[in-house]
């Protein structure tokens, strides 16, 4: 894919990162300004707020209130309790720059007469006379206003209203009805609001199944029963292996791991099952309440207990004793429950709050605006986009309000997080809201469309500096990478204690339990899947709900699925790392070939310096690193890293490779497509197999030096070792090293090129176990 474009970005073409100068902090900002006021990372947006509190002495019982200015109109919910003194407690926010009139009207209407010309009463406010209120000023007290009829005559009934000009810093901003989403009505209005979510605290539940005794089989004459344990926690099922002890007293000594969520209201159910052919028959169950399970914070043994196993009849009655099971159950709070990909994690703290250290800083994010968004759907015969942002860091998720029907939405919302480790990543995703115009049941089945995602690693940011950049929003689709627009962000990472932050670089990344009692890769993968499932359920219960599709996209679920594109990208990263070593080897080879006699002579002199003055050699190397690091300070990166399509190989991936990457697991393909992909994977795996075999061969040749597998080679090596011992006893080590270095770098006149050296010839003749491979 050809990518062209211009700009002052750090990437190529339209996918570049651009530095911006937004009007934040009561004026423009330049990269290093340190603004400190509240909401100083966003542009101030002024709103006309109208808070409808209550009404009294209305001449009708079922009423609602409409608030309008110009063509914008919002309305409260209808009060259907036949009450002439209704309570509303709703707030309306009109963007001041888009006001289409000078008079704000608050109109009380009767539910039974929805006619626009038929009103119960109203009151008017001149916009020019409305006061301005900016936090931390106290909220304006609401006042009672007499209602007027259409002719301006005072009538019976009053309404309590508070009206003011404010900004997005107002406390009611997130709960208010906004004029930029006026086309959304009814129960869908809640899906346009901003929201702060907190992830539940998750713990690992460890169930060490030791043994069972006196199990009662359903078939008393059965010989060699195959007993296993099934664990149920919520919707999660974990199976043990079949016990190797084929009796009614089986032994396992196996760990079963679950993810449990506070406040531990659930119960763990263990089912003892006998595998009879393809079926598994339940011999009995045991229920353990999580609230009664011991919580383990530090490494140490947990006492084991015996639990009764009860068999329950098909009707749920007739419980009877079916044996005993020996368990060691604990809630392990010393682990960090991984719900994100480890390389993009935003938190590494243990589950137990007792193990938390004080925060080392504060992260502030200003979500300013987006520009040039692509049409995501069609409404009214034209393309449109209803965009909102979601940001996740640690256990705190934030969601901006939805800006309806615009390709250039302005949010200007600011959020803060406490930082406990600088080696963490904040993730910002942009989505198109598809839950604004459907019915409630329909909305639950709709997935919001992805517009793009940004990751920013805090350790790459200079503390107290404001970064204002426009990030490209990219989505990889089966037909290639596509730019969906740009989002402008302002980010600042402030350290509360520089010493505490520097100390973090000396501490383990994960809590101690991950190293003292490590979990297997399989367990971590299964537990991460469980944690993601719990978060999806928990965040989906809020209003507005964060859908499973949004949560999984933010948590990077599916990142471990095979992708040829990512495999090529990682291979090139590895090659890039070795490029420096390869260049150094080529340079040394040129020294040995004396292509530049002056350089070769200088290297010989340096070699003598290293051999005879090793102390100064180490000193020189450290000094060189120090000076070179200072020199590189002027060339340091000025921008935070961003998604690179060239590094990701997204611009050169073939359609079939992308189609394979987006295929479900297990694959939905069949026939020739699946055969072609399988053959391609076999070719890649075959090359990897050869490389691994070559590495194993070299290692086995080293081991064979003393194995006497080749008696002549071992004899030669032992003779060499014995002679070398004698030489070292009588010849100075410095002279030996000098001779060895000069021999390696000897002049071409005393060297035969293109012929392997004696050590190489000897090493290649050593045996390996490759001869034993079938």
Curated annotation (Swiss-Prot):
State the compartments where it is located: Endoplasmic reticulum membrane
Residue positions annotated to bind Ca(2+) 1 are 62, 110, 112
The leader peptide range reads none
The answer to whether UniProt assigns keyword Calcium to this entry is: yes
Question: What are the C2 domain coordinates in residue numbering?
Answer: 9-145, 184-307, 338-471
- Name the membrane topology term: Multi-pass membrane protein
- UniProt-listed PROSITE patterns: C2
Keyword Transmembrane helix present in the record's keywords: the answer is yes
Tissue specificity, per the record, is:
Observed in flowers.
Q: Name where it mostly resides.
A: endoplasmic reticulum
Q: Which cofactor does it need?
A: Ca(2+)
The residues listed in the UniProt record as binding Ca(2+) 2, with positions renumbered to this chain, are 110, 112, 118
One molecular function GO term is: metal ion binding
Report keywords, A-Z. Answer: Calcium, Endoplasmic reticulum, Membrane, Metal-binding, Repeat, Transmembrane, Transmembrane helix
Q: Name one GO cellular component term.
A: endoplasmic reticulum membrane
The record's Pfam families line, in alphabetical order, gives: C2 (PF00168), PRT_C (PF08372)
Show the segment(s) annotated as Disordered.
1-30
Q: Where are the transmembrane segments?
A: 608-628, 722-742
Give start-end positions of Gly residues composition bias. 1-12
Source superkingdom = Eukaryota
What this protein is reported to do is described as: May function as a signaling molecule by regulating the trafficking of other regulators.
Family as reported in the entry's similarity comment:
Belongs to the MCTP family.
Fetch the PANTHER family from UniProt. Answer: C2 DOMAIN-CONTAINING PROTEIN-RELATED, PHOSPHORIBOSYLANTHRANILATE TRANSFERASE ISOFORM 1
Designated name of the protein: Multiple C2 domain and transmembrane region protein 11
Quick one: which gene encodes this?
A: MCTP11
């Amino acid at each position: 894919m050809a990518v062209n474009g211009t700009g002052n970005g750090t990437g190529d073409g339209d996918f570049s990162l651009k530095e911006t100068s937004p009007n934040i902090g009561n004026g423009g900002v330049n990269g290093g300004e340190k603004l400190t006021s509240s909401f100083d990372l966003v542009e101030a947006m002024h709103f006309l707020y109208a808070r409808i509190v209550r009404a009294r002495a209305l001449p009708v019982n079922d009423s609602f209130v409409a608030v309008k200015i110009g063509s914008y109109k919002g309305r409260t919910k209808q009060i259907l309790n036949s009450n002439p003194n209704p309570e509303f407690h709703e707030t309306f926010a009109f963007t001041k720059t888009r006001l289409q009139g000078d008079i704000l009207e608050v109109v009380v209407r009767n539910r039974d007469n929805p006619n626009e010309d038929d009103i119960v009463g109203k009151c008017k406010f001149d916009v020019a006379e409305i006061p301005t209120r900016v936090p931390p000023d106290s909220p304006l007290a609401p006042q009672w206003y007499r209602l007027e009829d259409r002719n301006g005559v005072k009538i019976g009934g009053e309404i309590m209203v508070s009206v003011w000009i404010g900004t997005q810093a107002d406390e009611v901003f997130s709960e208010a009805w906004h004029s930029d989403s006026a086309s959304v009505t009814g129960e869908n209005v809640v899906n346009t609001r901003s929201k702060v979510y907190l992830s539940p605290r998750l713990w690992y539940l460890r169930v060490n199944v030791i043994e069972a005794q006196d199990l009662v089989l359903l078939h008393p004459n059965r010989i060699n029963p195959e007993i296993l344990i099934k664990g149920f926690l919520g919707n999660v099922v974990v199976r043990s292996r079949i016990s190797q002890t084929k009796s009614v007293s089986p032994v396992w000594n196996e760990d079963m791991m679950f993810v449990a969520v506070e406040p531990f209201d659930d119960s763990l159910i263990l089912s003892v099952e006998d595998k009879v052919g393809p079926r598994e028959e339940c011999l009995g169950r045991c229920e353990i309440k999580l609230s009664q399970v011991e919580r383990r914070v530090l490494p140490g043994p947990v006492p084991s207990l015996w639990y009764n196993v009860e068999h329950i009849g098909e009707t749920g009655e007739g419980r009877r004793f079916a044996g005993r099971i020996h368990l060691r159950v604990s809630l392990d709070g010393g682990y960090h429950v991984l719900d994100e990909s480890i390389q993009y994690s935003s938190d590494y703290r243990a589950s137990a709050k007792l193990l938390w250290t004080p925060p080392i800083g504060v992260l502030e994010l200003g979500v300013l605006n987006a520009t040039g968004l692509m049409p995501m759907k069609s409404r009214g015969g034209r393309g449109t986009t209803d965009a909102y942002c979601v940001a996740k860091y640690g256990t705190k998720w934030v969601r901006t309000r939805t800006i309806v029907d615009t390709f250039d939405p302005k949010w200007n919302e600011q959020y803060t997080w406490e930082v406990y480790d600088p080696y963490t990543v904040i993730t910002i995703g942009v989505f198109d809201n598809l839950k604004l115009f459907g019915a409630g049941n329909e909305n639950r089945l709709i997935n919001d469309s992805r517009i793009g995602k940004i990751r920013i690693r805090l350790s790459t940011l200079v503390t107290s500096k404001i970064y204002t950049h426009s990030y490209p929003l990219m989505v990889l689709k089966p037909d290639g990478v596509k730019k969906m627009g740009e989002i402008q962000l302002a980010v600042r990472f402030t350290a509360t204690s520089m010493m505490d932050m520097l100390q973090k670089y000396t501490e383990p990344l994960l809590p101690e339990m991950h190293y003292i009692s490590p979990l297997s890769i399989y367990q971590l993968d299964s537990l991460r899947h469980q944690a993601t499932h719990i978060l999806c359920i928990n965040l989906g219960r809020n209003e507005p709900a964060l859908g499973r599709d949004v949560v999984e996209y933010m948590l990077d679920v599916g990142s471990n699925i095979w992708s040829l594109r990512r495999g090529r990208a990682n291979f090139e990263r590895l090659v890039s790392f070795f490029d420096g070593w390869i260049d150094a080897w080529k340079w040394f080879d040129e020294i040995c070939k004396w292509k530049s006699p002056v350089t070769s002579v200088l290297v010989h002199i340096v070699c003598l310096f290293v051999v005879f003055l090793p102390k100064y050699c180490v000193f020189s190397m450290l000094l060189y690193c120090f000076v070179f690091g200072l020199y590189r300070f002027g060339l340091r990166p000025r921008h935070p890293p961003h998604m690179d399509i060239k590094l990701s190989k997204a611009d050169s991936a073939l359609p079939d490779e992308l189609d394979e990457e987006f295929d479900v697991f297990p694959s939905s393909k069949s026939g020739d497509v699946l055969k072609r992909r399988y053959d391609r994977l076999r070719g890649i795996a075959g090359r990897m197999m050869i490389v691994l075999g070559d590495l194993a061969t070299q290692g086995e040749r080293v081991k064979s030096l003393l194995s006497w597998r080749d008696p002549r080679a071992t004899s030669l090596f032992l003779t060499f070792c014995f002679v070398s011992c004698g030489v070292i006893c009588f010849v100075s080590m410095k002279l030996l090293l000098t001779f060895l270095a000069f021999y390696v770098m000897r002049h071409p006149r005393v060297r035969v090129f293109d012929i392997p050296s004696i050590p190489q010839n000897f090493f290649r003749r050593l045996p390996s176990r490759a001869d034993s491979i079938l």
